[in-house]
């Protein structure tokens, strides 16, 4: 069965979804005469004109509610219109887990638009909704911001939600730039990279984004030991529990560590560790993973806040 590519454009009302789709249709028609099936789940101030739809070879259907978004009906639309691609302008308030799609559809890209001018208010009050949206996104575009500075405090929280996504800042002319440019809060050029408690999330994310900064380096920080029968012999996870959204969303973020010092460690024990960093191929994750080889381990008291709370 030949799959039809689906481009999923998500986000809240008036965040720039329609403007982006119109620009995409306009640019694509210059290169090819592909037919587009446009499924609109939310109508804002910007509208699709009949002239645009006809000129760009686009058939549009508007869904008034999530109950109307029926996969059998969509399947009929596909059979009748025979599109080369499907573009979905999603309603950001809909529960995506309740949506079903015909088997012929294949979602190839999810782009989420967020109004940067109100992001801090909505993110602090609707964090679970943003979590759900961002987790499924390939690209996250912030609009209505002149510079990325207001986003800097949220960099770690957003990347912990989905570190595989590209976070972009898009201006009114649809020109894009990286959303995050803030300097690291620690010195990666130091002989020993010292990580403070508040900076652990930033460190964790950056080791994936910039492996070249850390490979062969030495790190020092306070961390929790996690033991498991599922780990290779004489290894442990050096990690921390982080709350990025709410109490139900607490997750462990850590790295595999070799117990090269043969320390008698206990599960959930806290240690002060200095360790060498290397990257080794992981068959489980099919990519290089950071591995720690301790130089020194000292037992310490557990911190007052065992869970690193990024919601504050």
Tell what function each PLM region has.
Residues 2-15, 19-120:
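Nucleotide-state-sensitive switch-loop elements of NTP-binding domains
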Residues 12, 19, 34, 107-108, ...:
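OB-fold and OB-like single-stranded nucleic-acid-recognition modules
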Residues 122-128:
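Nucleotide-sugar donor phosphate/pyrophosphate-binding loop at the beta->alpha transition
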């Amino acid at each position: 069965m030949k799959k039809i590519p689906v481009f999923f454009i998500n986000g809240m009302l008036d965040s720039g979804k329609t403007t982006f789709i119109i620009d995409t249709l306009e640019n694509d028609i210059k290169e090819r005469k592909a037919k587009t099936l446009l499924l609109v789940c939310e109508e804002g101030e910007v509208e699709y004109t009949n002239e645009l739809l006809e000129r760009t070879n686009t058939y549009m259907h508007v869904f008034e509610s999530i109950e109307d978004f029926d996969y059998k009906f969509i399947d009929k639309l596909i059979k009748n219109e025979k599109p080369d691609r499907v573009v979905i302008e999603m309603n950001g308030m809909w529960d995506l887990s309740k949506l079903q799609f015909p088997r012929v559809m294949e979602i190839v890209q999810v782009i989420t638009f967020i109004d940067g001018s109100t992001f801090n208010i909505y993110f602090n009050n609707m964090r679970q909704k943003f979590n759900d949206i961002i987790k499924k996104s390939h690209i996250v575009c912030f609009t209505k911001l002149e510079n990325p500075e207001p986003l800097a405090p949220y960099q770690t929280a957003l990347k912990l939600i989905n570190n595989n996504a590209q976070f972009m800042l898009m201006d009114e002319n649809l020109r894009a730039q990286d959303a995050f440019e803030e300097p690291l809060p620690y010195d990666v050029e130091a002989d020993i990279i010292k990580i403070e408690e508040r900076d652990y999330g930033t460190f964790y994310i950056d080791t994936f984004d910039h492996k070249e900064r850390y490979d062969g380096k030495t790190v020092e920080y306070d961390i929790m030991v996690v033991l498991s029968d599922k780990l290779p012999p004489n290894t442990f996870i050096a990690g921390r529990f982080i709350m990025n959204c709410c109490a139900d969303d607490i997750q462990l973020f850590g790295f595999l560590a070799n117990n090269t010092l043969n320390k008698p460690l206990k599960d959930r024990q806290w240690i002060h560790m200095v360790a060498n960093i290397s990257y080794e191929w992981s068959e489980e994750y099919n990519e290089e993973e950071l591995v720690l080889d301790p130089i020194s381990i000292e037992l310490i008291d557990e911190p007052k806040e065992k869970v690193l709370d990024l919601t504050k």
